[in-house]
């Protein structure tokens, strides 16, 4: 603590707050920020062909597949673009496109049906992530809202990790649906489900699974307490509607699509086009909340980089007549190639965490663990619990290790947070990784299974703490950290003087709370 305070010209002692969960979360945020900071954007150039058939135009993306003169060429950025613009232009010139059009031949035309099932029900983490996106509120605020809804008997117990129902609840689920007929926004939907009896057999679906429930089943509406709904805030009322609609969706059929993939060839160069046509709206008809600005769509956001797995997206360009013409396309048919153009893009860095995605990252932290046995130990539970994750994130913000943009809910480290990270990285590196939590959880499991005694487990734990504390005390970090602190500080507009005031306040708060560990 003194090393950090000296660097900030404060000179006061200040305890450093650490914990097996909170320090791991700090590490995740700092690592992500440094990945973004060090990322070097790479430009690339895709070639898009403009095709037509009986008056209907559509785009196709060129790829260097087998048979192309550019197959596995060093000139490529992946298989669907070039590193240099002049190489992309050379390809266009080689296609010999002359007005008004030249011919291309369809060498593959695939049509297949796809289904999109209703999502699983909300657990707390998934609800916090959704509310962060929809309402730009923190996980802590979401927890307070859903706790209020629970206390008013509007929803079931909120601090749950499960996204499914229990068999016992499924048998009585018609009561919840029946109660929702008193909720004006979904009255007709609830009545329709009851009349069709589509709730019957729900226990045989993926939405009911006793094995996936540890303490409590998913968050669902009780179908009661509607008088209390008038006394909650607008945001709370909207959160309730989101929970209700997610619940009712599982009693609706899947959305259905016709996926058409076309491959057209011109002078041995292949272009790919895809069309995704909704044939049955299914649950999407009721999924969109009444306050939403626009209807839910199933279209996934395109990445800046583009994907080699997806051909040119034509989903939003088709009317009924166009759809019928596209359906007629078959292997061996000739279509028009009017032109080709270069679309410039650039690689993009990883995204910063927002408050919702951070909660999900904590829940899914096991994915970051390479060791299979350790990964299995926290699979399905992650780091922290549904009841503590929001609190841990809030604490990191309160002690000024992390910064939360209230408008966007984006999370970034502070200068102090990065300095703490560097100190922990050099002294007790294990605290920054979920492997530590997983190994401790594994030890607890071994105690429960009788493979080791409680005394043996505590001995190993005490040994870990003692050894690392002695290691920190035995080394002089005063001069070691300055280059790291300088490097981090260069990325912050805040002067040391401002940082000094902030950190001094943080240090005072820490001493009062005695640094309770997460």
Segments and roles (model prediction):
Residues 11, 164-176, 236, 274-282, ...:
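Short secondary-structure boundary/capping segments
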Residues 158, 200, 255-259, 263-267, ...:
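GHKL-family ATPase ATP-binding module
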Residues 70-72, 282-286, 422-425:
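A short, polar/proline- and glycine-enriched secondary-structure boundary/capping micro-motif
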Residues 82-241, 247-251, 255-259, 297-444, ...:
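Structured DNA-binding interfaces in DNA transaction proteins
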Residues 430-500:
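Non-catalytic DNA-recognition/assembly elements of restriction-modification systems
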């Amino acid at each position: 603590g003194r090393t950090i305070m000296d660097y900030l010209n404060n000179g006061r002692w200040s305890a450093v707050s650490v914990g097996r969960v909170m320090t791991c979360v700090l590490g995740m945020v700092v690592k992500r920020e440094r990945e973004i900071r060090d990322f070097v954007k790479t430009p690339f150039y895709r070639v898009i062909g403009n095709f037509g058939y009986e008056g209907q135009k559509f785009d196709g993306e060129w790829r260097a597949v087998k048979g192309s003169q550019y197959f596995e060429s060093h000139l490529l950025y992946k298989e669907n673009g070039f590193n240099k613009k002049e190489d992309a232009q050379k390809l266009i010139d080689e296609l010999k496109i002359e007005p008004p059009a030249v011919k291309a031949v369809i060498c593959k035309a695939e049509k297949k049906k796809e289904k999109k099932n209703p999502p699983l029900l909300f657990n707390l983490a998934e609800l916090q992530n959704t509310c962060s996106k929809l309402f730009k509120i923190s996980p802590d605020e979401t927890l307070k809202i859903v706790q209020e809804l629970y206390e008013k008997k509007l929803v079931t117990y909120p601090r749950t990790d499960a996204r499914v129902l229990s068999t016992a609840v499924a048998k009585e689920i018609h009561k919840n649906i029946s109660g929702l007929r008193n909720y004006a926004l979904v009255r007709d939907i609830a009545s329709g489900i009851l009349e069709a009896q589509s709730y019957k057999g729900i226990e045989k679906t993926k939405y009911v699974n006793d094995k996936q429930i540890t303490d409590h089943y998913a968050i669902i509406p009780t179908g009661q307490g509607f008088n209390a709904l008038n006394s909650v805030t607008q945001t709370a009322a909207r959160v309730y509607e989101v929970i209700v609609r997610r619940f009712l969706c599982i009693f609706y059929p899947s959305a259905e699509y016709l996926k058409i993939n076309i491959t057209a060839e011109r002078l041995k160069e292949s272009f790919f086009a895809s069309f995704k046509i909704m044939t049955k709206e299914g649950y999407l008809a009721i999924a969109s909340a009444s306050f939403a600005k626009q209807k839910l769509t199933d279209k996934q956001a395109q990445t800046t980089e583009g994907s080699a797995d997806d051909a040119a997206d034509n989903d939003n360009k088709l009317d009924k007549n166009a759809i019928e013409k596209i359906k007629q396309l078959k292997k061996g048919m000739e279509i028009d190639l009017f032109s080709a153009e270069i679309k410039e893009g650039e690689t993009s860095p990883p995204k910063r965490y927002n408050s919702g995605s951070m909660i999900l990252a904590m829940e899914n932290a096991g994915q970051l663990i390479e060791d299979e046995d350790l990964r299995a130990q926290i699979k399905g539970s992650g780091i922290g619990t549904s009841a503590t994750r929001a609190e841990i994130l809030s604490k990191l913000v309160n002690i000024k290790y992390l910064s939360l943009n209230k408008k966007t809910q984006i999370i970034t480290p502070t200068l102090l947070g990065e300095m703490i990270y560097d100190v922990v990285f050099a002294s007790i590196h294990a605290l920054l990784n979920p492997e530590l939590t997983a190994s401790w959880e594994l030890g607890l499991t071994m105690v429960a299974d009788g493979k080791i005694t409680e005394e043996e487990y505590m001995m190993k734990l005490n040994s870990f703490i003692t050894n690392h504390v002695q290691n920190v005390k035995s080394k002089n970090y005063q001069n070691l950290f300055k280059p790291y602190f300088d490097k981090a500080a260069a990325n912050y507009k805040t002067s040391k003087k401002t940082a000094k005031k902030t950190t001094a306040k943080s240090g005072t708060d820490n001493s009062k709370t005695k640094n309770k560990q997460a």
